[in-house]
């Protein structure tokens, strides 16, 4: 194998093999953040996570919802990365843990405010001659 072929990055779903049996974070198109152990995947990057939690962040607070075994359709994945357990602990200890039931309404409120701001910004940009793209679920 020559050096040129070694430089080309491996970007297909096969590159996920290094993450199997490791703790990963998955960010979905709708903004959900899932943390769990990647157990399996297929050629379409459909994922199976075990011991999954859905983590909700609001300001300096976070809450976890246990989801157990979770199957994610590959087209909904925006980001997938391995978690460094030490760094995760250091990052989370700076936040206040709250019950997810209390945070969920706050998260919905923040999401609605964000959508409203995006709509207002889009209207303004359109009024000064810019083209505004994006659909109702185009969050990335």
Curated annotation (Swiss-Prot):
UniProt domain Sm: residue ranges: 11-86
Location(s) in or outside the cell: Nucleus; Cytoplasm; Cytoplasm, P-body
BP GO terms, sorted: deadenylation-dependent decapping of nuclear-transcribed mRNA; mRNA processing; RNA splicing
Gene Ontology molecular functions: mRNA 3'-UTR AU-rich region binding; mRNA binding; poly(U) RNA binding; RNA stem-loop binding
Ribonucleoprotein in keyword set: yes
SUPFAM superfamilies for the chain: Sm-like ribonucleoproteins
Record keywords, A-Z: Cytoplasm, mRNA processing, mRNA splicing, Nucleus, Ribonucleoprotein, RNA-binding
GO CC terms, sorted: cytoplasm; cytosol; Lsm1-7-Pat1 complex; nucleus; P-body; ribonucleoprotein complex
Residue runs in coiled coils: none
Region: Confers RNA-binding specificity, residue numbers: 129-140
Keyword Membrane recorded: no
Protein family membership: Belongs to the snRNP Sm proteins family.
Subunit organization: Component of the heptameric LSM1-LSM7 complex that forms a seven-membered ring structure with a donut shape. The LSm subunits are arranged in the order lsm1, lsm2, lsm3, lsm6, lsm5, lsm7 and lsm4.
Name used for this protein in its record: LSM1-LSM7 complex subunit lsm1
Gene coding for it: lsm1
